[in-house]
């Protein structure tokens, strides 16, 4: 047998072997027949099929037995204010951060319960700063190829209306605050999707232009910065047309909780912040539970910030049983906290109740859903999706938490009068972040923040903007 024939036969064997392997890996008629028989052999499946076809899955899976555990009493609760409404926007992080600040202002100055800081005011600056963050990041990475993972991530995520607490802190420090009636909501701030799409499209176009400009021989950094400034003029115009221009000065009348006028004065955003929200954000620490990473270490997420020269999200990773006492200490001292979780899991929308036993999917579908918290995060099945204000805890006779309550920003008609109640078991499984003031944190944890953080990439499974 000559070499050519031998090579041909070997090649044919490889092809046949690969074909056989691929066939075995696909769904064969025999396999499909076996799958179908396993379903059809159980008579109850037909009844379930008919029931699910005409109803919502959650209505069928709802555990009526578990509803007896629903309870709205709380042993420790921070006095609540009028519930806010972020409407059809992803600004939960902003509403939550400002709710923490307004709670302090209302208590200090005896303001009406419906007092609010303007969310759209800070959102205007947020979108301008995020646009600059994206454009400057494109300049910084201009020498990297287009398929570089960081460059790819930037173009996939040029801007969003989501965010987190360090964004609130940086924006308030830089731009101040105004009351809600000094800059009111618009259709575009309440429904952000259209403007977000337009702005994202323009930023991607600008990003490509900056990369092309930076690739040309002789282009200086000063030229890139000048062009970026011109691009931000366009961004500013888009924002101003959608939201209006932020006020540089305004007159506002302070009223007491009964609505009686107390004082009328002129303010700038900075002077209004200094009077009504004079807080030191450096005393606010981010605590997180990410069981897939080593505990008692500080982590930082690259590009997880709102302002280019601001702060990335930086947190101390702790076990859940060590986070709860920090939150309890804060609530006992009438201090609300920025809190975020995976809000959609096992949520009874009608009651505003979060309980891992709300829905019995295992009995309905005849299979267990057995991933733990670590596995859910690793496989992108769970993560921090929504920020709210942690305001209450119900403790048992041993001072251990039974359930928690958060003030939401979906309006007062959602859930329990605008609040959500969560069992401690749900809290442990789906709570991820809480921001605690230093006076409620033991010194041993504060010292851990002095260590150099472990830098994580922005595409880490744990991190996405809270909406």
Where are these regions (language model features)?
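Bacterial Sec-dependent N-terminal signal peptides
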Residues: 1-26
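Histidine- and/or cysteine-centered catalytic micro-motif in compact active-site loops
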Residues: 3, 342-344, 393
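N-terminal regions that are enriched for targeting/export leaders
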Residues: 26-82
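Active-site nucleophile-adjacent alpha helix/oxyanion-hole segment immediately C-terminal to the catalytic cysteine
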Residues: 69-321, 325-337, 414-416, 424, ...
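Catalytic nucleophile-His microenvironment captured as a short glycine-rich beta-strand/loop
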Residues: 92, 172, 378, 383-411
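Short His-Asn-centered micro-motif
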Residues: 95, 339-342, 391
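Long, positively charged binding patches that form subdomain-scale interaction surfaces
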Residues: 310-385
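Conserved catalytic-core surface of thiol
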Residues: 396-467
């Amino acid at each position: 047998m000559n070499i050519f024939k031998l090579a041909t036969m070997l090649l044919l064997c490889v092809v046949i072997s690969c074909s056989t392997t691929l066939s075995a890996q696909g769904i064969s008629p025999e396999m499909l027949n076996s799958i179908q028989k396993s379903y059809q052999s159980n008579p109850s499946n037909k009844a379930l099929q008919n029931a699910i076809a005409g109803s919502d899955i959650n209505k069928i899976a709802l555990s009526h037995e578990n509803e007896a555990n629903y309870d709205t009493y709380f042993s420790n609760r921070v006095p609540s204010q009028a519930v806010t409404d972020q409407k059809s926007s992803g600004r939960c992080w902003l509403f939550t951060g400002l709710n923490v600040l307004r709670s302090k202002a209302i208590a200090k100055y005896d303001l009406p319960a419906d007092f609010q800081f303007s969310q759209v005011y800070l959102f205007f600056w947020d979108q301008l700063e995020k646009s600059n963050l994206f454009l400057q990041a494109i300049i910084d990475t201009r020498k990297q190829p287009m398929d570089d993972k960081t460059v790819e991530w930037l173009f996939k995520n040029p801007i969003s209306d989501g965010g987190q607490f360090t964004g609130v802190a940086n924006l308030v420090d830089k731009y101040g605050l105004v009351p809600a009636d000094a800059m009111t909501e618009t259709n575009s701030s309440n429904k952000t999707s259209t403007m977000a799409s337009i702005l994202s499209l323009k930023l991607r176009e600008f990003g490509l232009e900056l990369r092309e400009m930076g690739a040309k021989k002789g282009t200086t950094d000063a030229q890139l910065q000048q062009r970026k400034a011109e691009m931000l003029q366009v961004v500013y115009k888009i924002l101003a047309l959608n939201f209006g221009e932020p006020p540089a000065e305004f007159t506002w009348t302070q009223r007491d909780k009964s609505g009686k006028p107390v004082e009328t004065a002129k303010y700038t955003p900075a002077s209004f912040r200094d009077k009504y929200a004079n807080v030191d954000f450096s005393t606010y620490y981010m605590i997180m539970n990410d069981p897939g990473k080593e505990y008692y270490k500080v982590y930082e997420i690259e590009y997880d910030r709102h302002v280019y020269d601001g702060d990335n999200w930086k947190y101390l990773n702790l076990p859940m049983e060590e986070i709860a006492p920090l939150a309890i200490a804060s609530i006992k001292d009438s201090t609300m906290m920025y809190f975020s979780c995976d809000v959609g899991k096992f949520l009874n929308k009608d009651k505003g109740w979060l309980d891992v036993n709300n829905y019995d999917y295992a009995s309905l579908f005849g299979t267990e859903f057995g991933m733990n918290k670590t596995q859910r995060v690793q496989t992108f099945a769970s993560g921090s999706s929504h920020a709210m204000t942690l305001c209450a805890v119900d403790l048992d006779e041993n001072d251990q938490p039974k359930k928690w309550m958060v003030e939401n920003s979906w309006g007062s008609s959602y859930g329990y009068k605008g609040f959500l109640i969560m069992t401690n078991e749900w809290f442990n499984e789906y709570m991820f972040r809480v921001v605690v003031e230093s006076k409620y944190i033991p010194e041993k944890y504060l010292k851990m923040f002095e260590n150099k953080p472990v830098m994580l990439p922005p595409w880490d499974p744990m991190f996405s903007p809270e909406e």
